[in-house]
A protein has these predicted regions:
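Short, conserved phosphate-binding/catalytic loop or strand-edge motifs used
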Residues: 130-138
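Second-shell residues forming the walls of enzyme active-site clefts
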Residues: 14-15, 21, 42-62, 66, ...
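N-terminal basic, low-complexity leaders that serve as flexible interaction/assembly modules and, when applicable
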Residues: 2-34
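Alpha-helical scaffold segments that flank or form the walls of functional sites
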Residues: 97-122, 203, 272-278
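A charged helix-plus-loop insertion that forms the helical arch/lid used to bind
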Residues: 82-100, 146
């Protein structure tokens, strides 16, 4: 489970340059403003190297949160020496054929992913994806369980249950829904042109029905013109009003990567971080 008190953690989550912690990075991780570090494929060579890297991180800051995107399918940062996890949509396809077997597979996948990461000292995988499947989405696509609210909620709860049994809390993403835009927010800023009713009755419903099972939520780098002109992670309407107030979510809200192409033009790194904090 989440071992750290979110109120005492620093607000920044940093990434690392390579597979070995540099002296500069060691010093950065000791700053009180830093509460977490996210690992990518460039930080991973082998299980033994990962153990050494995590030991070095913990030596610099024993209380820091260590996270990774280990969803399965095409988004799995640690591969060699780790289980090959299924894409969530393959679980969704099984669910269509046999709902019971789909739920079992979801729970087993969540447990296996979490148990393996925690064995190496990783606290969080940013999972599961709660976006609805839409074939036009390049960036989400088969990362999503299903195109239906009911199927996504059912499988997500089973997956989260598996994570929890292994001792890891869940982070739902990408609030309030990234699956209905074609553009990839790693490269450009997507706009979701759906009406507010369509958003609320779609992806948002998944978050609403799963919120009590989540310790954290990651926001989307997507603009929803039906609500405002801000990306969701900078939007008080989406974070403070709907997530914090309407859904009564008291957990951690992670912004998606603030160095991504979709937000890189929105001021300096410091300004982008401030805007995310101000949103709630």
């Amino acid at each position: 489970m989440m071992k750290r008190d979110q109120n005492t953690l620093g607000r920044l989550m940093l990434d690392l340059e390579g597979a070995i912690l540099s002296e500069t990075e060691r010093e950065l991780l000791q700053k009180s403003s830093v509460g977490g570090v996210i690992l990518f494929s460039r930080n991973y060579i082998s299980p033994s190297q990962l153990k050494d890297l995590i030991a070095a991180i913990r030596e610099s800051n024993p209380d820091i949160l260590i996270a990774v995107d280990q969803e399965g399918g095409r988004v799995q940062r640690f591969r060699k020496g780790f289980l090959a996890l299924p894409a969530l949509n393959s679980i969704g396809k099984l669910y269509i054929r046999d709902a019971y077997k789909g739920r079992i597979m979801a729970e087993q996948s969540g447990w296996a992913m979490a148990a393996e990461l925690m064995h190496y000292g990783v606290d969080l995988s940013f999972a599961p994806v709660l976006d609805l499947y839409n074939r036009k989405s390049r960036v989400i696509g088969d990362r999503a369980f299903s195109g239906s609210v009911e199927g996504t909620v059912d499988l997500a709860r089973s997956y989260i249950n598996g994570m929890n049994k292994a001792g890891m809390v869940a982070t739902g993403k990408h609030y309030p829904g990234h699956g209905s835009v074609e553009a990839d927010s790693h490269e450009e800023l997507p706009q979701d042109e759906r009406s507010l009713d369509a958003i609320i009755s779609g992806d948002y419903q998944v978050f609403a029905k799963c919120v009590s099972h989540l310790a954290a939520i990651m926001s989307a780098h997507v603009v929803y013109p039906a609500v405002d002109t801000e990306i969701a992670g900078f939007s008080r309407a989406w974070i403070k009003d709907r997530l914090r107030s309407d859904l009564a979510f008291e957990g951690v809200v992670f912004s998606d990567d603030l160095s991504m192409g979709g937000v890189s033009a929105m001021g300096s790194a410091e300004q982008r971080a401030e805007r995310a904090l101000e949103a709630g």
